A protein has these predicted regions:
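Intrinsically disordered, low-complexity, charge-rich segments with an acidic bias
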Residues: 228-244, 254-269
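Glycine-rich flexible loops
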Residues: 1-228, 242-252
Length: 269
């Protein structure tokens, strides 16, 4: 029971941070695995979520409880498909929409992006993940790695804890910005992506450095209210000022296949 209460607090705090970072508007959710169930934020503005408003859903659920986001099926599908997934964030970074419309996969072009996976796949169906079948099809695109771009529908990130999933969502937004900027700056020249060895070296230190990123995000200006264990009853969320989300350059990018790592990528002609 104590662990469950702490985990509810972690989910709620992560949700409020996600809102404060400007990565969600009226839509988005955070969840955590809790044994044979998951704890997920309600279908509500994440800026006001508290531990008491987090909802428990069995992983084997065939019907969603009242108040649960309709795309909770995506969380359930990922928990079933990925036993290593302990927490999930669902958001709509602006740059993620741009990359998912322009590419079929995003390979890291800077080191921290490797903490999202050896590459970030794009699920190509823009329909909402409001059914088991659609959610399972999306989950099948992420057999490994920690981030999935959803064409026309935002993104999903995984983590060892709710805060780690949110840190990866922030990092995914930043990685998409860098990717788009690199494509714009390169002009007619191909973009050089990280090699397999470079990706492996960055992934090797992710467990050490990603928690530092989460601490930075949770402690930033307008920090999101009480931390887990500090909430009393419904609690009073803190200052939820939301900075502008990541900017996106308008680019005319064609769909690409996965580039060769460690060498400039080449679009098919």
């Amino acid at each position: 029971m104590i662990r469950d209460a702490v985990l509810r607090g972690e989910v709620a705090e992560a949700a409020r941070v996600l809102a404060r970072l400007g990565l969600v508007t009226a839509f988005g959710h955070v969840s955590a695995r809790a044994g044979e169930s998951m704890l997920i934020t309600p279908a509500a503005d994440l800026a006001g979520v508290t531990a008491a408003s987090v909802i428990e859903v069995p992983l084997a659920a065939r019907v969603l409880p009242a108040g649960v986001p309709a795309e909770a099926w995506a969380h359930l599908a990922l928990y079933r498909a990925r036993p290593d997934a302990a927490a999930i964030a669902r958001a709509q970074p602006t740059a993620a929409f741009a990359v998912a419309a322009a590419a079929t996969v995003m390979v890291p072009v800077h080191g921290q992006a490797a903490w999202l996976g050896e590459s970030v796949p794009v699920y190509g169906d823009a329909a909402l993940l409001r059914s088991t079948d659609r959610a399972e099809r999306a989950a099948s695109c992420l057999p490994a790695g920690e981030a999935l771009l959803l064409r026309g529908n935002g993104a999903l990130t995984l983590g060892a804890a709710p805060g780690m999933a949110v840190a990866r969502m922030w990092l995914l937004a930043a990685a998409c910005d860098v990717y788009l900027a690199a494509r714009a700056a390169s002009g007619a020249n191909p973009v050089t992506t990280l090699s397999d060895d470079e990706i492996a070296s960055w992934r090797a230190v992710g467990g050490e450095l990603l928690p530092r990123l989460w601490e930075h995000l949770r402690s930033g200006p307008g920090s999101a209210g009480p931390r887990p264990g500090e909430e009393q009853g419904q609690g009073q969320p803190g200052d939820h000022r939301r900075p502008p989300g990541p900017r996106v350059m308008p680019l005319d990018l064609r769909e690409e296949r996965e580039p060769h790592r460690g060498a400039p990528d080449r679009e098919e002609t």
